[in-house]
Design a protein with these regions (language model features):
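Glycine-rich anion/phosphate-binding loops
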Residues: 84-98
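An N-cap/entry alpha-helix motif that binds or orients negatively charged groups
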Residues: 1-70
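Alpha/beta enzyme core
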Residues: 81, 94-95, 119-120
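Active-site-adjacent beta->alpha loops and helix N-cap segments on the catalytic face
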Residues: 86-88, 106-124
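Glycine-rich phosphate/pyrophosphate-binding beta-alpha loops
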Residues: 78-84
């Protein structure tokens, strides 16, 4: 796969490249997966209105979330045990979120401490899952 154009492309690539145990953990939801299925169904229901022949020169995805300026209205959600995928997984994700101007949420099940993540991002604010 030379070009990734959607989340499904990433999932297919991960299934080929990531050890099975780690892939299964990341690709699944917890317990009965009811929230996972509900999220998938809700996501499928989102439709974007096409705007043809509209000047896009001054468009921006920037907005605010919880009073903070963000580059776009998305955030990295908490993912438990990200360190199973990469030893510094949470810190790398927090740095990426900072670089792209979006919020990062540290999981309660993180293998990295709040202090380590804060230091890794130069004290950049992030959210914490309680």
């Amino acid at each position: 796969m030379s070009v990734i154009t959607c989340i499904e492309d990433l999932r297919v690539l991960a299934e080929k490249r990531v050890p099975r145990m780690f892939y299964d953990y990341a690709d699944a939801g917890s317990w009965t997966e009811s929230t996972y299925r509900a999220n998938e169904a809700d996501f499928q229901g989102i439709k974007f209105r096409q705007r043809v022949a509209v000047n896009m020169d001054n468009r921006s995805t920037a907005t605010t979330m919880l009073g903070e300026r963000v580059a776009m209205p998305v955030a990295i959600a908490p993912t438990g045990l990200t360190g199973m995928q990469h030893a510094d997984g949470e810190m790398l994700a927090a740095r990426a979120a900072k670089q792209f101007g979006i919020p990062f949420t540290l999981s309660t099940m993180s293998i990295c401490s709040i202090e380590d993540v804060s230091e890794a991002t130069g004290g950049h604010p992030f959210w914490f899952q309680l």
